[in-house]
Structure formats: structure tokens, C-alpha cells
Amino acid sequence: MAIKFRSSSDREMNRGSFADLRKLNNDELVILRANIETELNRRGISFKVGEVGEKLVISFFNSKPGLPNLLQAPVGAKNVDALSRDGERYSIKTFMKAKKTGTVYPDEKDRDKQLFEYLVVAKLDTNYRLFAIYRYPWGDFVRIRAWDRRMNAWYLPLSKKNLDMAELIFNKEPSHED
């Protein structure tokens, strides 16, 4: 996803002429991060891994012919982050280094009730760029999900075996056939 710059000074800032972060000591860097987080919050901009992943996945799907166009689900929709034009529900989970996804809370009355049509798992690199996108239909999620007793919810262990079971939508890694 490219950043559109409003002016040449914006481009210069992105190249590093605005501030060379390598010149800051650790304390200065932490203070800068705190100030940036404060300003993001003031503007209502979230920079949590999960929310960044949701936006990147929706944008990726919408930019690729052959993939459904997705719309962000209404705020507060339980376990659903995006909707296709055909009404299919997508739950999007994002990770960088984690060993499992975030939780999927079951229906209070029926623990096995279908909550979405697809679980999409997005892997981001440490620069918050898409590294891989995996898609699981509901039935596959049900077969490989695990129960978190503390959270009273489902999650997906991010083992190689489980990731290999998914439909690989995008992968930044070079294939072994290259």
C-alpha cells in the first residue's frame, strides 16, 4: 500500500530528511514514540497490529481481480471484520511474531454456531507491511481451532502445519521453485 504525498516536503520527510531516527538516543526515541501515539489517539487513528492488518487485507482484496471486494464491517460487529458484496462474513486476524491468532468468541448459546464464512490470517513484517495472507473456510477453521480456557474463546495455533492447510492468497517469500 503506497503513501500518497501532498507535497514535495512530505516526500522529503518520508526519505528521512525530516529526522534521522538513528541519531536519537533510546530515551529520545521512546519519548518520540509516546508523542506520536498520543497524537494518533487524539486524531482517532489506531495503529494496532490487528487494525493495520484489517485495513491492509481489505485493500489487498479490493485491488486484486478474482478476489471478492470487501467492505469494513460496522464497528462492534462480533467476530466479523469485513463483508463481501455477496454477504460473506470475514474475520481477520493479524500477527507479526505470535504463535497463535487473537480470539474468536463463540455464540453464548451454541458454542459451535458458524460465526463467519472465512477466517483470514494476515502476517505482517516488522515494518507493518503484508508478508502473507492465509484464508480458511469456516469448516477448516473448526477442524484446527483450539480452545483458550482463560479467555473462554477459540484461537488458531499458527503452526506450519495449520498455515499450510490454508488457501495462500499472498506470500512475499520467494517460492521454493524459483
State where each predicted segment sits.
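Nucleic-acid endonuclease domains
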Residues: 1-178
